[in-house]
Amino acid sequence: PQPPTADALRSLPTDLIYGLPFQTSDSFARTLDRVNAVGPDRMSVFNYAHLPKTFKPQRRIDESQLPEPKEKLKILQMTAEKLSEAGYVYIGMDHFARPDDELAVAQREGTLYRNFQGYSTHSNCDLVGMGMTSIGSVGNCYAQNVRELDTYYEVIDKGQLPVFRGIKLNHDDEIRRGVITQLICHFELAFASIERQWNVDFRDYFEPEMAQLHNMVNDGLLEINDQGIYVTPGGQLLIRNICMVFDVYLKQHSGQRFSKVI
């Protein structure tokens, strides 16, 4: 890196989006080659979320020009291969990092954490949302600010908090958050750790979920034994799908999901 960058920043990240109109695995490979030449410390490769009902500019996009799920999965697989060859470590959930980046170090040391903003080396920190649409998290509560800029300024000018909705996690929410966090950060989960922390029998508590996971075992995405759940290398690219099994709210809000997995 250039000296000013090295002095001011600990890590230089880059975000890429796949699933855009006319993208193919070949065109995205060329993009990756150009980005790799720059050599960012971290790379996030996100699936494009096409939500024209929510975002008006997206209504200009012809949906027939978007790549099919099969092509997007091909792009994702190719991305993982090329970045691995370039020396990046797969952190999980679309994230890659250099081996000496603090995220990769935290992953090796078992201290990696993920909140709703992404992967972090700081676990269980309170977050204060600043600006419109931002989300804050304090303890077991989440709150989101208003989405419209004019409304945001209007509420601020009144000396009020611009929060328009929030949620307080119940006991089941916290257990599920712990399960998802372990899987999404470490690609494995020890039944005993959840049982000690929450005083539950894991396989009894999550009996329906365990039945779904066994289908993923048959697909080669997971291994399950008496001690816990282990995500295979092939399953790591689809860790979001695996964690979705434990999301009790997913079916309730299936029509409002923010982006397709593939």
Where are these regions (language model features)?
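A short, conserved structural fragment
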Residues: V217-Q227
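Short amphipathic alpha-helical interaction segments
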Residues: F202-V217
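C-terminal scaffold of the Radical SAM
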Residues: P1-R203, V261-I262
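Intrinsically disordered or highly flexible coil/loop and linker segments, enriched in small
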Residues: P162, E188-L189, L222, Q252-G255
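Short, amphipathic alpha-helical interaction segments positioned at domain boundaries
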Residues: Q236-I262
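Residues at alpha-helix caps and immediate loop-helix transition turns in enzyme cores, especially N-
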Residues: S27-F28, Y205-P208, I242
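Minor-groove-contacting beta-hairpin "wing" of winged helix-turn-helix DNA-binding domains
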Residues: G228-T232
